[in-house]
């Protein structure tokens, strides 16, 4: 708890081989539910918790209904419990994570679904809770195109960079062939760049009538090109810097970036009180900061570091 700001997620409940909740004397639903509830009561609520399979998660929460947007981020165990998969992409079953028979009983929380059913389930809940693990065992399910498809649908935020080397080397020796700026890059580089969130400012527009208005309306479109959302709220600001004097004006932006799902876009509408600005030319930049880590959020735009240059405004 002392280092809660540096910890995204705690995997497992300290049971099983390598902490993976398998091969344990404490693996019944009652056991893992007791352990998880007690652990949740002790761990800082800003830290997410995780279990090895979707079946574990449903068994603990006693529901097959996926977490919904109106339940997210309220501090409850339901809103904190995510997943880690150390058999990821290892077989059609992800090494025991999934089954070969479809769901049949809506009240049997311990049954496993098929690969497609369970990935569809993760596609919903992992818009709000993290998912990660390690990709293992070189096989068709971690061939590059298959891996990208499923990592995206499962909303994967992190992977072990040391294991499985056979899979990681395969990605390093594979080439991303889709059109766009990544064409020709290694599969490893593409996957690494898309784990978690990846923000990109794709469009800006200003609506201002000097003879009629005192304020300008700036619209900024942000795309999330990553596999997952961010699960921590960042501080977002617009910075106007006078190009002659260097003086800056900061405009707070009310934006809950956690709600920007993977593959989606949000439009930020910001009112700028132009009449209260000193006359001159201003550079406009967007800033996003992780206040917990005291670090800037870097966008995917070219030449962006701590801010994204948006354009200029003349008063």
Annotated model-derived regions:
Residues 6, 155, 234:
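Residues that flank catalytic or metal-binding motifs in active/ligand-binding sites
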Residues 192-315:
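Extracellular/luminal regions of secreted and cell-surface proteins that mediate adhesion/ECM remodeling
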